[in-house]
A protein has these predicted regions:
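Conserved acidic catalytic loop of the alpha/beta-hydrolase fold
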Residues: 109-127
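Conserved hydrolase catalytic core segment
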Residues: 125-165
Length: 317
């Protein structure tokens, strides 16, 4: 019996662990960071995971969020399933070029063109596009203006920008205004944690997740005053996309938290109603940004399952 156990370990367990280890190492080896020039002196920080010949997934963060919003776990899970993952920092945020917005203003349509430029630079003809909050606006605009480049679309914690979407409660802006970062992580952390706890919704708040998220912001840039202010200004000329979304044929998933106090859940419901080929997922207790491991895992699993379901039958890029 003893030798049978030893034989099982030698013949099965050790080779399996070796193979799994090689697979993880290969994923790490296939991660690349680079800058992509999108306009004049503007360069965007871009991270890619996996084999560039595989079907692509483009992750688009929201205002005041860098690429770390999309976890390593999520990216690697998609690579293991045979996808090429791309995520990046928007202009004027994270590692990407900083801009004097008053001298060189931009809008969300320009941010949409940035996304297309990234795909072009990476020789990606089509991609599954996944956007959160403002990133959801960009994902929608990609599907509207560049339908030939979009395999499927996920719009999370976003809306159509219709006037019928209820505005955030006054408490939301009050909490935002109370947070006045000074580029000192230790001193500023308490203010950010208050904001993150509020945006988390009613689920149990995971402080460790929130601290890591905040630290990632400080590691990439100076954090002073209103975070992502230029991105908020960039949204000022957004129009209602209801009628444009109704014309889309792209497979779509709309994810929204039941307790989103920044973008009301009606924004997600209405977005799904506009899209002919869509599925709506409302996650109980989830707010605008999930700082709860269980809810975050659910959020990521919904993305993985949808992208897998809408994988193309051919291997052409």
């Amino acid at each position: 019996m003893y030798w049978k156990v030893i034989k099982f370990i030698v013949l099965i367990i050790i080779p399996l662990n070796f193979i799994l280890g090689m697979r993880i190492s290969n994923i790490e080896a296939l991660k690349m960071n680079r800058y992509i020039k999108v306009e004049n002196d503007i360069r965007l920080w871009v991270e890619t995971y996996g084999d560039e010949s595989d079907e692509a997934v483009l992750f688009i963060s929201g205002a005041g969020a860098n690429s770390t919003f999309w976890s390593e776990r999520l990216c690697k899970a998609l690579v293991e399933k045979g996808f090429y993952v791309v995520k990046y920092d928007h202009r004027d945020f994270g590692y990407s070029s900083k801009i004097d917005y008053e001298k060189n203003p931009f809008d969300v349509m320009q941010l949409t063109k940035d996304a297309i430029t990234i795909l072009y630079s990476l020789s990606i003809n089509k991609a599954h596009v996944v956007g959160h909050s403002m990133g959801g606006f960009i994902a929608q605009l990609l599907a509207i203006h560049y339908p030939e480049r979009v395999l499927s679309m996920i719009s999370a914690s976003s809306s159509t920008n219709a006037e019928s979407v209820p505005p955030p409660p006054s408490e939301t802006w009050e909490i935002f205004m109370e947070n006045n970062p000074t580029n000192n992580f230790e001193n500023d952390l308490e203010g950010f944690l208050k904001v993150w706890k509020y945006l988390n919704g009613t689920a149990e708040f995971d402080k460790e997740l929130a601290v890591e998220y905040t630290r990632n912001l400080y590691e990439r840039q100076e954090i002073k005053g209103a975070i992502g202010a230029s991105h908020v200004k960039a949204q000022s000329n957004l129009n209602d996309r209801t009628e444009q979304l109704k014309k889309l044929q792209v497979p779509a998933l709309v994810i929204h938290g039941e307790e989103d106090y920044l973008v009301d859940k009606f924004g997600g419901v209405q977005t799904a109603e506009c899209l002919e080929s869509s599925r709506l997922v409302l996650i109980p207790e989830m707010g605008h940004i999930p700082f709860n491991e269980q809810i975050l895992a659910r959020f990521e699993q919904e993305i993985i399952q949808f992208v897998e379901k809408n994988r193309r039958k051919t291997d052409s890029n």
